[in-house]
Amino acid sequence: MKVSISHKNNFKGVSYQAQALLMSKSVFAKSPYAKLCKSFGFEGEGKFFLQEQALLLVCVEELGLDSIREAGASIARHFRTLPYKNVNVALNGKLDDSKAYALLLGALLGVYECVSYKTKTPPLHLKEIILLDEKNEVASESVLKKVHIVAQSVNEVREIINTIPQVATPKYLAKYAKELSKEVGNLECKILDEEALQKEKMGAFLAVNRASCNPPRLIHLSYKPKGAKKRIVLVGKGLTYDCGGLSLKPADFMVTMKADKSGGCAVMGIIKAIAQLGANIEVHSIIGAAENMIGGNAYKPDDVLYSREGKSIEVRNTDAEGRLVLVDCLSYAQDLKPDILIDFATLTGACVVALGEFTSGIMGHNDRLKAQFEKCALESGELMATLPFNRHLKKLIESKIADVCNVGSSRYGGAISAGLFLSEFIREEFKQKWLHIDIAGPAYVEKEWDINPSGASGAGVRAGIEFILAQGKA
């Protein structure tokens, strides 16, 4: 399906065309449709389809960007399997670039669903959603360019996260990254295999993957435009499957663990979009791709691991593995001398407990940087909130036999203590330049919500893109 913007209404009333009208509840109440719709019990909240007119009415409380974005998804979903090839969409109110972008992005992201493993799928009749801009209020070319690039990146990230673990191994992610660099053209790709990881002394990363028959990979994608204003390095947790290791997860908790690679997939999606948009920011995406499995060679609670930074780590829980992969990747990332360093990870269930399944957690030492990222995230349509570090929780990761322990000694504050663990491996010169984004909640939800399908949402991609674009304007 594609989206477009038209400066005149081409609706001819033919059988393959439909219309959608988006309006606020207050406007609906005064509209000529109100009396008819109310006779069918529709009071102006949600959507109502007038079949004879092939007209979908979509009513929202007010025409804010979040409501418009979600309405775009609702329109696309409604017509997804109906026998209409194109839908003309009109917004009853002033149109501008941000509203047009929100509606069309919502449509492209809302229509996505993972059907790769179904043997029978309903046909997608809908070919195009056309936004009407009769007053010529929208910079159509730039809006459409960004919409298509961002939507494609998010949907590709969703698809690779949804890819099953028997297919999506660390080698698979590495192959995908190589193909991505060739497709985009202005991306470079470097892959570190097991031998290279040993030379890099990534003892924590390697320990996590030890019991897997699928070897680990570190993936390094880079976008280096001439005269770049800043260098931003992104790090993503790429656990292609996580059974918990010897600290084995309960069976119900293992389901959906194919999504433990969401952070790694997100940073690939972000750099792809940034490169295609031609942003004047140098960006690197580093993905630690591994599997946390069980076996005679598995790393164990009571082990002490040595990280690339030289710090020793007492292992008390092998299911706190993502942070072990991340610390070695963050060490590698700091060698690139970033102006800003951000990691994305489905790191803790505790973050979901703290913020719910629709909101990501932002952590770090720089309040201004955290506020900037949260602002960009909210503008992109992603819910994020700051979780504050504190000295009391830091004491929970102290170890009596090593430099630091991989889990806190309390059942409380797990999202923050995990962030504080990562902070132990951030060099002093980068403390104020680093952010940790825990996307454990929204990365994979087993129900449709907002503009997201059941399954992978592509959490972090839109927020990361907007943040980097904002840095280019700063």
Curated annotation (Swiss-Prot):
Pfam families: Peptidase_M17, Peptidase_M17_N. It is found in: Cytoplasm. Gene3D superfamilies: Leucine Aminopeptidase, subunit E, domain 1, Zn peptidases. One of its GO terms (molecular function) is metalloaminopeptidase activity. It is an enzyme of class 3 (hydrolase). Mn(2+) 2 binds at K237, D242, D260, E321. Mn(2+) 1 binds at D242, D319, E321. Its cofactor is Mn(2+). HAMAP family: Cytosol_peptidase_M17 (MF_00181). Belongs to the peptidase M17 family. NCBIfam families: PRK00913.3-3. This is Probable cytosol aminopeptidase. It comes from Helicobacter hepaticus (strain ATCC 51449 / 3B1).
